[in-house]
UniProtKB/Swiss-Prot annotation:
This is Putative carboxymethylenebutenolidase. The active site is at residues 127, 183, 215. Belongs to the dienelactone hydrolase family. It comes from the Bacteria. GO terms for molecular function: carboxymethylenebutenolidase activity. The keyword Hydrolase applies. Its EC number is 3.1.1.45. It is an enzyme of class 3 (hydrolase). InterPro entries: AB_hydrolase_fold, Dienelactn_hydro, Dienelactone_hydrolase-like.
Length: 246
């Protein structure tokens, strides 16, 4: 059973930067855990807004910050070759330090909201956002992370930064990672490396690999959408947040 929600555009301060955010929250008065929703390379588009609303309907305050605020304020693209090209260019202009800073600022903003339980923080991200939330899972405030098909976690970072896998020893919460076995951007060796690192550092985790599913399988606006895999993954996300965020 889902709850009634309301949505609004918000501004998240981070020093001199004003980050645009999409906020979805239950209408009923109360206190709720918060889940930060992290975009793909395409910005906070209609799919990410929809996911933010779906999370809120499960009884969470959900916020999607604009990760490209520094590079391209208001950037939003669809799933076209042009959108992919534009999104990838912006991804390469980011920095891990700035991303972490903006994520921390979003969490800090959420913790000031009167209907948020400040100790109950979760993350969910897709595509580039899956990469970002693995990095973000290293923040001490984060209790639960759902990372969807984040390419490059073991070996890629913008500029000269270390890849997210090098932060695994700092992860204190529970992490679920979701991959499609048909996703050529994430070789099986990468997912095995992620699993080995999580096991080595005794991170509470589960890795889910979906046969027949490709990159972007959770997004119903993509040609690669896989309804069966998406439905199963959503149930696991709900289970994760229900268990870890009280």
């Amino acid at each position: 059973m889902t709850v009634d929600i309301k949505t609004t555009l918000v501004t998240i301060p981070n020093q001199n930067l004003q980050i645009a955010g999409y906020l979805a929250e239950p209408v009923a008065v109360g206190q709720y855990p918060v889940v930060i929703v992290i975009q793909e390379i395409f910005g906070v588009n209609s799919h990410i807004r929809d996911v933010t609303e779906r999370v809120a309907k499960e009884g969470y305050v959900a916020i999607a910050p604009a990760i490209y605020q520094r590079q391209a304020p208001g950037f939003e693209e669809g799933y076209t070759p042009e959108g992919i090209e534009a999104g990838r260019k912006l991804k390469d202009q980011t920095s891990s330090a700035e991303i972490l800073s903006d994520l921390e600022a979003t969490i800090a903003y959420a913790q000031t909201l009167p209907n948020v339980k400040p100790e109950e923080v979760g993350l969910i991200g897709f595509c580039f956002g899956g990469w970002i939330v693995y990095l973000g899972a290293s923040l001490p405030t984060v209790k639960a992370t759902a990372s969807f098909y984040g390419a490059g976690i073991p070996h890629w970072a913008p500029g000269t930064a270390e890849p997210p896998i090098t932060y695994t020893d700092k992860i204190q919460g529970t992490l679920y990672a979701f991959f499609g076995l048909e996703d050529t951007s994430i070789p099986m060796a990468d997912t095995e490396q992620i699993e080995q690192a999580l096991t080595k550092y005794q991170v509470n985790h589960k890795i889910f690999r979906y046969p027949g599913a490709d990159h972007g399988f959770f997004c119903d606006q993509r040609a690669s959408y896989n309804a069966e895999a998406a439905a199963d993954a959503w149930q696991k996300v709900k289970q994760l947040f229900q268990t870890e965020l009280k």
